[in-house]
């Protein structure tokens, strides 16, 4: 980590009603003594897409290069970005069995954000008394609920 640049702690989460189904994502960003909450939704998505989107949107909101710690309760996101992505890039976004990587569109966007920051990815057990994770979970649930309400209006 570079001691001369700002440190930001981010908690992310995704939620989906059905898989696929209406989903939401949320992130809590903490910098010094301030925090910012962001959330969003998609009407037809998966839980994994919402997990990736939460991290992507949290990184996109940062205006300058930062030292970042991202906490996620998604092993898919944490392992994907720290372990699997290197081979995906090398294999032109294909897995070792030559199948296309699922959610490659989002993984590619997230991968592009990596060069802008120094990032440490940490897995945290979901629903286990971690206040940042609980906050991100609530934000993702709000996003999911918004998607559900919009779909109700369309019926």
From Swiss-Prot:
Keywords: Cytoplasm, Endonuclease, Hydrolase, Magnesium, Metal-binding, Nuclease. Residues 4-145 form the RNase H type-1 domain. GO terms for cellular component: cytoplasm. Mg(2+) 2 binds at residues 13, 137. GO terms for biological process: DNA replication, removal of RNA primer. Endonuclease that specifically degrades the RNA of RNA-DNA hybrids. This is Ribonuclease H. It comes from Rickettsia canadensis (strain McKiel).
């Amino acid at each position: 980590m570079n001691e001369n640049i700002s440190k930001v702690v981010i908690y992310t989460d995704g939620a989906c009603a059905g898989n696929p189904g209406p989903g939401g994502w949320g992130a809590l960003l903490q910098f010094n003594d301030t925090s910012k909450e962001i959330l969003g939704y998609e009407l037809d998505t998966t839980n994994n897409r919402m997990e990736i989107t939460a991290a992507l949107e949290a990184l996109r909101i940062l205006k300058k290069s930062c030292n970042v710690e991202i906490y996620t309760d998604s092993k898919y996101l944490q392992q994907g970005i720290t372990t699997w992505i290197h081979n995906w890039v090398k294999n032109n976004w294909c897995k070792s069995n030559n199948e296309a990587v699922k959610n490659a569109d989002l993984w590619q966007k997230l991968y592009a954000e990596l060069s802008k920051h120094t990032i440490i990815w940490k897995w945290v057990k979901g629903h286990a008394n971690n206040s940042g994770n609980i906050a991100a979970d609530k934000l993702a649930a709000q996003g999911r609920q918004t998607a559900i309400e919009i779909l109700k209006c369309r019926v």
